[in-house]
């Protein structure tokens, strides 16, 4: 009887304790980089590279390069390139400088993901490109931050950004400094940069840094043909015209 009573008392104690009678679970601590956003993996194959175009729609894209505006050259070239990208490749589009604000802060946060990274997306990207006006500033760093933290559909697999800009950062930030910090904990992003007729040395150096630090490529494109070739090389598509490619490893 004593043994039976002891067993019953033991079970009652377990119930009253709410399970705390068992060994305590170990405590784990972890930390994540500032502003980093976790997104769960999707069911689709995560081994393929995701590609995000970031295109400059600042007011200076309305300037002429030869007989056409830089914006017209960029749009017509993108139309050709998008038709060459396989449908199974996940691509997306972010733009900046497409709107102005009443304050510098508003102008320096003028960047939007207008077409999320996904497969079979070429037509939608081109449609969005042709619906946007070039009117604002050049918040490159803000655009890169948004792209790195929010624009890719999951946290696995390789991610590539192709940045097309006709000028350097004109907000109070440094794309080079941001990328150096980002690469301390992110090794999954590569950035190719195409400088569209940029004559300013400091601006070029900032953009070269972005490519170099991420093991990407930097291109100088001063004509429509060179822009097309730069995009083809970046995307590993068949090249037709030899452009000017800068080796960032020198």
Where are these regions (language model features)?
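C-terminal motif of bacterial Sec signal peptides marking the signal peptidase cleavage site
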Residues: 20-22
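A short, compositionally biased domain-edge/stem linker segment
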Residues: 30-42
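Bacterial signal peptide processing site
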Residues: 24-26
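Methionine-biased hydrophobic packing positions in alpha-helices, especially
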Residues: 60-61
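Exposed acidic/Ser/Thr-rich ligand/metal-binding surfaces
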Residues: 37-39, 49-55, 65-72, 100-192, ...
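An active-site-proximal "capping" alpha-helix that borders the catalytic cofactor pocket
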Residues: 70-87, 93
């Amino acid at each position: 009887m004593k043994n039976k009573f002891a067993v019953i008392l033991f079970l009652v104690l377990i119930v009253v304790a709410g399970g705390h009678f068992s060994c305590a679970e170990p405590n784990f601590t972890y930390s994540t980089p500032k502003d980093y956003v976790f997104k769960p993996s999707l069911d689709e194959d995560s081994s393929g590279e995701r590609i995000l175009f970031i295109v400059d729609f600042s007011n200076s894209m309305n300037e002429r390069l030869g007989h056409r505006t830089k914006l017209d050259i960029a749009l017509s070239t993108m139309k050709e390139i998008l038709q060459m990208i396989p449908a199974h490749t996940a691509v997306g589009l972010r733009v900046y400088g497409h709107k102005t604000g009443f304050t510098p802060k508003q102008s320096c946060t003028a960047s939007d993901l207008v077409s999320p990274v996904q497969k079979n997306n070429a037509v939608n990207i081109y449609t969005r490109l042709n619906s946007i006006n070039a009117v604002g500033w050049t918040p490159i760093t803000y655009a890169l931050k948004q792209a790195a933290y929010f624009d890719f559909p999951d946290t696995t697999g390789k991610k590539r950004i192709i940045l097309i800009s006709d000028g350097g950062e004109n907000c109070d930030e440094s794309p080079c400094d941001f990328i150096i910090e980002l690469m301390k904990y992110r090794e999954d992003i590569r950035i190719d940069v195409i400088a569209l007729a940029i004559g300013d040395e400091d601006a070029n150096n900032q953009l070269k840094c972005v490519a170099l630090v991420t093991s990407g490529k930097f291109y100088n494109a001063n004509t429509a043909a060179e822009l097309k070739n730069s995009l083809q090389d970046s995307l590993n598509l068949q090249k037709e015209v030899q452009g000017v490619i800068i080796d960032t490893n020198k």
